[in-house]
Amino acid sequence: MENNNNNHQQPPKDNEQLKSFWSKGMEGDLNVKNHEFPISRIKRIMKFDPDVSMIAAEAPNLLSKACEMFVMDLTMRSWLHAQESNRLTIRKSDVDAVVSQTVIFDFLRDDVPKDEGEPVVAAADPVDDVADHVAVPDLNNEELPPGTVIGTPVCYGLGIHAPHPQMPGAWTEEDATGANGGNGGN
């Protein structure tokens, strides 16, 4: 039976790299045993749905492979957009452009932050770049406001002294590398 529904993923017709990626992914042997995403985390996410009572053994592996292919496709499309703009780095604006121009990524439109087109300034020293955005108290006054510590906000902004706060349930490096006694979340 022929499927005339265009809602499924089609290989892109305009770019050889994307065509090659999808043709290899669709016709090749999908090795779902080697995965990039932690399977235990995927199982936990699947179990959050109250309608899910049992999970087949291969379902988390297939979902991991699907996520890997999805991220790779979005990254490749963003990279191509960055190259079209004569840049070597993928920016928010590249991901935003890909999401807004590609029909299959419509579901991400509300979740990908819009790039406001902020001017790009090349900073030689990252501390100088952060210091421009931090309010510095007037040092001509002998007394500083209570609770003011000079130097700490700049260092904290760079993540030197303390780790950034993490959302509850977010992945950590330990989850990805398997530092909890597992082998990468398997």
Swiss-Prot record:
Principal cellular location given in the protein's record: nucleus
Tissue distribution: Expressed in inflorescences and flowers.
Places the protein is found: Nucleus
Annotated Gene Ontology cellular component terms: nucleus
Superkingdom of the organism of origin: Eukaryota
Pfam families xref list: CBFD_NFYB_HMF (PF00808)
SUPFAM superfamilies per the UniProt record, alphabetical: Histone-fold
GO molecular function: DNA binding; DNA-binding transcription factor activity; protein heterodimerization activity
Keyword annotations from UniProtKB, A to Z: Activator, DNA-binding, Nucleus, Transcription, Transcription regulation
Region (Disordered): 166-186
Family: Belongs to the NFYC/HAP5 subunit family.
Function: Stimulates the transcription of various genes by recognizing and binding to a CCAAT motif in promoters.
Complex and partners: Heterotrimeric transcription factor composed of three components, NF-YA, NF-YB and NF-YC. NF-YB and NF-YC must interact and dimerize for NF-YA association and DNA binding.
Name of the protein this chain belongs to: Nuclear transcription factor Y subunit C-5
Organism name: Arabidopsis thaliana (Mouse-ear cress)
Name of the encoding gene: NFYC5
